[in-house]
């Protein structure tokens, strides 16, 4: 589909759904074809447009904050697969999320092959130290998500310094505040990592302000 035809198909799906607020997921697959890995054998790609309600976390967790563990499952190195690619291959993320469930946590932090923070299973990671808002760069394996980009503008409006740099778990342990962002999740406070309290152990004031700003 051409760009405008695709945009109209999305609008048509939204109109047919009748929702004023919802989540749009656009999926493009290689379409029908024989068994095998070669996409050239599938000349007719398939486009799927999904419009639905999406609740990633229960409302109570936005008020209390979530507990996160560090997964043994690592993020694929950026040199192997470009983290800017938004694909349906979530196997490593699913494995990490299962680790979180087994540990009684809500989410799992994924490190890259060098042991630095990449992202969580479906969200970008942020740590606040003073007026510095820290987040891993995409080169560490983090997806350059939509909400992450919006957060950059909101941080500047709040007078925060936006800092993309390598982060270890220690940087999260000693952070004043920590939170995750995602298109569906929005802004999710993190109050503990691997059983260690972060900040006051409650959602911090900057996290709450950024969350409120995202909705204005």
Task: Locate predicted features.
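Short amphipathic alpha-helical face segments that pack within enzyme cores
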Residues: 146-150
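Conserved alpha/beta cores of soluble small-molecule-handling proteins
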Residues: 1-109, 113-116, 143, 153-216
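Glycine- and Gly-Pro-enriched alpha-helical subdomains that act as flexible
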Residues: 108-109, 116-139, 144
């Amino acid at each position: 589909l051409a760009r405008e035809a695709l945009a109209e198909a999305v609008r048509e799906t939204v109109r047919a759904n009748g929702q004023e607020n919802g989540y749009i997921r656009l999926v493009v697959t290689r379409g029908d074809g024989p068994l095998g890995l070669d996409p050239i054998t599938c000349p007719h790609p398939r486009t799927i447009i999904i419009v639905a309600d999406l609740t990633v976390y229960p409302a109570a967790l936005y008020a209390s904050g979530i507990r996160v563990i560090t997964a043994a499952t690592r993020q694929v190195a950026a040199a192997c697969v470009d983290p800017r690619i938004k694909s349906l291959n979530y196997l490593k993320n699913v494995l990490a999320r299962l680790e979180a469930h087994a540990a009684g946590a809500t989410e799992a932090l994924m490190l890259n092959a060098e042991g630095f923070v990449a992202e969580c299973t479906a969200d970008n990671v942020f740590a606040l130290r003073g007026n510095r808002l820290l987040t891993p760069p995409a080169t560490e394996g983090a997806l350059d998500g939509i909400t992450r980009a919006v957060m950059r503008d909101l941080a500047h409006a709040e007078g925060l310094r936006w800092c993309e740099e390598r982060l270890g778990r220690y940087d999260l342990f000693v952070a004043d505040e920590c939170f995750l962002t995602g298109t569906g999740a929005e802004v999710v406070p993190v109050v503990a990592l691997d059983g260690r309290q972060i900040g006051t152990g409650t959602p911090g004031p900057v996290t709450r302000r950024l969350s409120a700003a995202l909705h204005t």
